[in-house]
Amino acid sequence: MFTHVKPTVRHIAPDDLKGRALINVVYVVLEPQYQSALSAAVRSINANNPNVAVEISGYLLEELRSPENYEAFQKDVAKANIFIASLIFIEELAEKVVEAVQPHRDRLDAAIVFPSMPQVMRLNKLGSFSMAQLGQSKSAIASFMKKRKENSGSSFQDAMLKLLRTLPKVLKYLPVEKAQDARNFMLSFQYWLGGSSENLENFLLMLVDKYGDVHAPDGSAIGYQDPVTYPDMGIWHPLAPAMFEDVKEYLNWHQSRPDIGDDLKDPLAPCVGLVLQR
């Protein structure tokens, strides 16, 4: 997949810092599905958060084949506070990502890598939680990544959910001081899997709160909300307050709607539905 859009279209910076701390974020992903939600998340922070502003630069993995883009990526990483990557499974491009990020890993406030090749996953760092030894031990995370590589046909969602089930088992074997960082690592997956602009906004604020040197003027923490989770499968309607996990639940809501007439509530009335991958 080669793109004709320059990475600069994903660059967002605040118009006015207004005395706030500036956090630089760089991300590289396989496909552009997160671009809209991430952009909306950053714009919301810059417009509404009184304590922190975000400058973000984004790259699609294939764009790093271009020497010009790769040089820009290296420069952005060199000044970043937070690095995010997802689905880096192309060997030669994975090596380029590692080459650019590894020299700055220890300096970064946080490095979050969602399922990718082991050498990229080793960049993960959240406080005392690290994946630098991934593949060198028989840990649950190492076993997960091995199975993920062997079962490359499984979906991104399935892989995420497997990891979210595995991590709580890992936590009980960690020293107390590492447990909180491991929990934040797990929360990062939940924010990312949720994928909404609200989840991604709170994901960034969580990282800043826990790992950035940023505080409110009164010394309090940067506020954020827990991730909003969604059903693995469900029925979504744009006017409904939430997703429905089964047909009966959806029909109960549909039949009680005050905004439609009885003709549309007729079980034989035409209805159009779309089957979509989450």
Regions found by a protein language model. Give the residues of each.
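An N-terminal assembly and electron-transfer interface module characteristic of large anaerobic redox
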Residues: 1-278
